[in-house]
């Protein structure tokens, strides 16, 4: 009898943990690759500023775009509470840009992770897909919340800036991969999509039968800038656009979404990061 009661109690406890809501802060951030010609905004001048911003904002998870291997290592050194997963897109190791996922290791464990190439053969390392002009990837991590055991998938990407077929096909591929890896469990897709919300690639994401929602559009509260790309404050304000997004599956509630406005005297990147407060 005592064993039965113990088992029932364990089942109830497990159920209550899985039903418990989890609040997390999740961001996307194109950090601009390490280009010495960006002076005075080269990576060496910005890296501590970027790390301090992340610490101040207390992100639980964030996706990065454009970081090279040295930047990936810098971030890990400057942010000891975070673990990063990802590979360089050119050789699946350290060459080329990463689309890395960073998570606070005090909050989450990574149960699994990987990278696939945005191409007709997602396993073909370094392959350009469709009409793309660059090699493109998506990196994912299956995360488990330490306190509750909840599972959530992080996917982070950087779409091609030219190939419209590649942009649309990348959306379809990522949706398939989310379904394969976590099924109907919560997932968050972040990235620099190199398109606006008027594009076919964007509409493929939000109108597919596997629904992903634009976090900024469904948030209970929004704030900040209306655009993400500003080219180190050089793009005409009238021509700036939002090309970086956070998408969530429907079981995730978006409490707040903000595009952090640039500060001209202390630019973080040529893109503004977007962060979201989520209830999972």
Regions found by a protein language model. Give the residues of each.
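Active-site-proximal beta-strand elements of phosphoester/diester hydrolases
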Residues: 23-35, 99, 111-116, 150-159
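Bacterial Sec-dependent N-terminal signal peptides
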Residues: 1-23
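His/acidic metal-ligating clusters that form di-metal
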Residues: 135-157, 164-193, 198, 202-204
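N-terminal, active-site-proximal structural segment of metallo-dependent hydrolase catalytic domains
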Residues: 15-78, 89-97, 280
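Active-site environment of divalent metal-dependent phosphoester hydrolases
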Residues: 33-36, 67-73, 161-163, 194-202, ...
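Acidic/histidine-rich helix-loop elements
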Residues: 28-48, 94, 118-134, 160, ...
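Structured beta-strand-rich core segments of catalytic domains in phosphoester-bond hydrolases
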Residues: 61-151
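Metal-dependent phosphoester-hydrolase catalytic domains
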Residues: 165, 176-187, 195-280
């Amino acid at each position: 009898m005592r064993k039965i009661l113990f088992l029932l109690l364990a089942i109830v406890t497990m159920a209550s943990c899985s039903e418990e809501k989890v609040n997390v802060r999740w961001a996307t951030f194109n950090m601009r690759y390490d280009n010495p010609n960006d002076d005075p905004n080269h990576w060496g001048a910005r890296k501590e500023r970027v790390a301090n911003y992340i610490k101040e904002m207390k992100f639980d998870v964030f996706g990065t775009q454009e970081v090279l291997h040295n930047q990936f290592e810098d971030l890990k050194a400057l942010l000891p509470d975070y673990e990063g997963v990802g590979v360089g897109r050119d050789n699946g190791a350290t060459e080329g840009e990463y689309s890395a996922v960073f998570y606070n290791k005090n909050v989450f464990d990574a149960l699994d992770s990987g990278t696939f190439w945005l191409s007709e053969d997602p396993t073909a390392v370094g392959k350009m897909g469709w009409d793309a002009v660059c090699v493109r990837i998506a990196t994912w991590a299956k995360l488990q919340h330490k306190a509750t055991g909840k599972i959530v998938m992080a996917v982070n990407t950087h779409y091609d800036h030219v190939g419209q077929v590649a942009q649309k096909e990348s959306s379809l591929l990522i949706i398939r991969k989310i379904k394969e890896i976590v099924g109907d469990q919560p997932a968050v897709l972040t990235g620099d999509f190199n398109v606006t919300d008027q594009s076919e690639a964007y509409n493929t994401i939000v109108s597919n039968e596997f629904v992903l929602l634009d976090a900024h559009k469904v948030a209970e509260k929004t704030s900040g800038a209306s655009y993400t790309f500003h080219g180190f404050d050089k793009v005409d304000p009238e021509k700036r656009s939002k090309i970086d997004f956070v998408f969530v599956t429907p079981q995730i509630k978006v409490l707040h979404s903000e595009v952090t406005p640039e500060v001209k005297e202390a630019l973080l990147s040529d893109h503004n990061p977007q962060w979201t407060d989520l209830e999972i």
